[in-house]
Amino acid sequence: MRIAILGRPNVGKSSLFNRLCKRSLAIVNSQEGTTRDRLYGEIRAWDSIIHVIDTGGVDQESTDRFQKQIHQQALAAAEEASVLLLVVDIRCGITKQDEELAKRLLPLKKPLILVMNKADSQQDLQRIHEFYGLGISDMIATSASHDKHIDLLLERIRQIAQIPVPSVEEQDAVQEDELPSEEAAISLHAFADETLFENESLSQEEASFLEELVAQTATPAPVDRPLKVALIGHPNVGKSSIINALLKEERCITDNSPGTTRDNIDVAYTHNNKEYVFIDTAGLRKTKSIKNSVEWMSSSRTEKAISRTDICLLVIDATQQLSYQDKRILSMIARYKKPHVILVNKWDLMFGVRMEHYVQDLRKMDPYIGQARILCISAKQRRNLLQIFSAIDDVYTIATTKLSTSLVNKVLASAMQRHHPQVINGKRLRIYYAIHKTTTPFTFLLFINSNSLLTKPYELYLKNTLKAAFNLYRVPFDLEYKAKPARKSN
């Protein structure tokens, strides 16, 4: 079931949206027009998921150049949803915009709840009778900012959706012993086998205990959920246009003015029976270019989108040089260890330029580009758009492939035979054991004799060896080390 939240500007729609979804997804600000696109979230309750759509404030008398598109987005959300919430400001009484919206929504013959928001005091509640004139029988007074009567609204939504309240089941009296955490068990892998350390051994009791812990550690099953893909880039490079072109509909408001997108907009899409969630982000600006609190929050949300996405699509403008902001975004993607693809948009404007030469030159401009997958596309002409899906799938498949422990150890053993570590103070680095610890982020854990014997050049050699062996040129990864604990003297 889908619920659309509609209303004129600044009545608290985004605050209500955040309260229902129990997380701050929409930017909340007293400035009118903060929300422009449709923003999607979820209510997770009663063992069910209800999708919620936040829309921009509708005001046909506004001179805002985006208002026509905001109006179209709101009406599209109303058509898409099965339940409608018309939000009004109880303190203002009925306005002309409220009346116009009610007249638009009532003929849709869908369940319609009038949410009289900002009912912060008992005095506000005394104005409920004023709203009978809108002709909406289902009315609930709320205060989203103070979390008042949100439970009543949720209960009404549950009733309309005909979701049964889950029965309380008796808890099993027998509780299973808690297994060791994956991190704790992983750290013991190198010590579970007596043969790992030459001339050193564990007691039989210690070895049996550690082997049991290691046996209980299983590779977690892959998460069965849509793949999250964030489009990142500085303002006005065409991120929203790319999403609209992929979906073949105007899901995101576009304009030549930088900063059109403010919220992070999650857009679900299915391609070849595979589910994706594209996250359209606000463009990252230079700090001195951020003029107000809304733009600051938009830039902050962009970084949060990078942190929560599975893969990043960095969008750059083919007609412009790689900018400081592009390089800043690349370093941010690298810091979060996110697999990524670079989309060079507006290729339709590049005349007389050979694509392979452009790509070669682009790789030389920043070390973080390296061997990243680069696609030259045109959202305007829909050129090479389908290649985006194959690029996403190829890179993400490599980034989430769990490597076998035996194969990782064979690769490292061969590397050490080809190129021995240097001797430091009469000792040489030894790698006893290695595992592929995690895929997100992609991390190897190496058990060694001493951190002091690992030099930076040799670490780079090991990293390049693993990169070549497992085709990790397009996947950022880390090496972690765990040194053998010092033996206790009797």
Curated annotation (Swiss-Prot):
> Matching SUPFAM superfamilies, A to Z?
P-loop containing nucleoside triphosphate hydrolases, Probable GTPase Der, C-terminal domain
Q: Which residues bind GTP 2?
A: 233-240, 280-284, 345-348
GO molecular function per UniProt: GTP binding; ribosome binding
EngA-type G domain location is 1-165, 227-400
Domain KH-like as annotated: residue spans: 401-485
Q: Which family does it belong to?
A: Belongs to the TRAFAC class TrmE-Era-EngA-EngB-Septin-like GTPase superfamily. EngA (Der) GTPase family.
Q: What does this protein do?
A: GTPase that plays an essential role in the late steps of ribosome biogenesis.
* Description of how the protein assembles with itself and partners: Associates with the 50S ribosomal subunit.
Q: What name does UniProt use for this protein?
A: GTPase Der
Task: Please report the organism this UniProt entry assigns to the protein.
Answer: Chlamydia trachomatis serovar A (strain ATCC VR-571B / DSM 19440 / HAR-13)
- Provide the gene name from the record: der
